[in-house]
UniProtKB/Swiss-Prot annotation:
Pathway assigned in UniProt: Purine metabolism; 7-cyano-7-deazaguanine biosynthesis
Catalytic activity, reaction form: 7-carboxy-7-deazaguanine + NH4(+) + ATP = 7-cyano-7-deazaguanine + ADP + phosphate + H2O + H(+)
Protein name: 7-cyano-7-deazaguanine synthase
GO biological process terms, semicolon-separated: queuosine biosynthetic process
CC cofactor: Zn(2+)
Organism field: Polaromonas sp. (strain JS666 / ATCC BAA-500)
Highest taxon in the source lineage: Bacteria
Family that this chain belongs to: Belongs to the QueC family.
UniProt EC number: 6.3.4.20
Residues at which ATP binds: 9-19
């Protein structure tokens, strides 16, 4: 039986929801983030605020929340010419993928997370990737995650489990899951303290949180919140 987990925690809506689920399931939960030269580096500050607020607002989770880790992955920005690591406009590429796709990002994240989990004796890796509401990123697909789980388990001779709580749900359902896990208190925390905007905008407050409201990440989060809120208003 698994008792511990390492959550890949960026400080966004999805990873915060995954962290809440891990805290509801496991006795010991640690977190890890990556500094890869992302334009929205403000998320690295936001995640610390989220961790602080979780400890404050959810005292039953606080004792389970262990060490937080930040890994330097600047080399990823050196090999990736994308709109997440360069000051260029968001657009679709000829490949059919948006230029927000950072090749190899989630593969590297999972590899480094597994190496850290190996050293920390953590049994489960938790990541917020999904196939339902995503931009076609191949490293978010269920087949990719299953292949990574097998490769990491074989390569480190340790049976890892990679959990993807959001794999088959959309953004509206992610809001619903957050409410189911932590009630309105968790929804409010996500609105006020998590960060999604690719441009790093923390000056514009929307109904769903802070962001420019126009980048792909903001649009996806906004649509999900609108559907979630609309369902709540129905008798």
């Amino acid at each position: 039986m698994h008792t511990s987990a390492l959550v890949l925690f960026s400080g966004g809506q999805d990873s915060t929801t995954c962290l809440a689920q891990a805290l509801s399931k496991y006795e010991r939960v640690e977190t890890v983030a990556f500094d890869y030269g992302q334009r929205h580096k403000v998320e690295l500050d936001a995640r610390l605020n989220v961790l602080r607020e979780i400890k404050s607002r959810f005292p039953h989770w606080a004792p389970k929340l262990g060490e937080d880790h930040l890994l330097d992955l600047a080399v990823l920005g050196q090999v990736s010419d994308t709109s997440l690591t360069r000051d260029v406009a968001f657009k679709m590429e000829n490949s059919g993928l948006p230029n927000t796709f950072v090749p190899g990002r989630n593969l590297l994240f999972l590899t480094l997370a597994a190496a850290l989990a190996y050293r920390r004796d953590l049994q489960v890796l938790v990541t917020g990737v999904c196939e339902t509401d995503f931009s076609g990123y191949p490293d978010c697909r269920d087949d990719t995650i299953k292949a990574m789980q097998l490769a990491l388990s074989l390569g480190m001779d340790k049976r890892f489990l990679i959990e993807t709580p959001l794999m088959w749900i959309d953004k509206a359902d992610t809001w619903r899951l957050a409410h189911a896990l932590g009630g309105q208190a968790l929804v409010d925390l996500i609105i006020e303290h998590t960060h999604t905007c690719y441009l790093g905008d923390r000056t514009h407050r929307q109904a769903w949180g802070y962001g420019c409201g126009a980048c792909p990440a903001c649009e996806l989060r906004a649509r999900g919140y609108e559907r979630y809120a609309a369902a709540l208003s129905k008798p």
